[in-house]
Design a protein with these regions (language model features):
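Non-catalytic, conserved peripheral segments adjacent to functional cores
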Residues: 1-104, 123-125, 132-153
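Short beta-strand His + acidic residue motifs that chelate non-heme Fe in jelly-roll/DSBH
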Residues: 109, 117-122, 130
Length: 153
């Protein structure tokens, strides 16, 4: 697995080693020891899987009381995935990074706790799978508008 820190260094792009031939492919999608070395010591407690159609925008969601870290990947289709730093004491507060994730590039994005997260589906359909560091709590769910002028996505 290759780990690449992005313009906001706490957000990390993961690119797996894919072994493929005419029969198909194999790839390792997560290894705790490597993840801790490159991204920090986090425990994942919930996995989610969503499906969306072209043009659907999900997010940008974040939490205040129990912020979720998310390791996200696309297993079908393509999305433009965005993380916005919502940590008020961070030197990158209000800044964002975005990456295309797809079934073809097989890349994943680590979005740490304290970030707003969302994605836009750019293919006909997309299936999105992600691990979370805390449980979903609808009472602690907040949204940031994708076109917020101060963020400037």
């Amino acid at each position: 697995m290759e780990y690449q820190k992005l313009a906001i260094p706490d957000v990390v792009l993961l690119t797996p080693k894919v072994f493929g031939d005419e029969r198909g492919f194999f790839m390792e999608t997560f290894r705790q020891s490597e993840f801790e070395q490159h991204c920090g010591n986090y425990q994942f407690v919930q996995d989610n899987h969503s499906s969306s159609t072209k043009g659907i925008l999900r997010g940008l969601h974040y939490q205040h009381q129990k912020p979720q870290g998310k390791l996200v990947r696309v297993v079908k289709g393509e999305v433009f995935d965005v993380a916005v730093d919502m940590r008020q004491n961070s030197p990158t507060f209000g800044q964002w990074v975005g990456e295309y994730l797809s079934e073809y590039n097989k890349r994943m994005l680590w979005v740490p706790p304290g970030f707003a997260h969302g994605f836009l589906v750019t293919s006909e359909t997309a299936e999105f799978v992600y691990k979370c560091t805390d449980y979903y709590n609808p009472g602690d769910e907040y949204s940031l508008l994708w076109n917020d002028e101060t963020v400037g996505i």
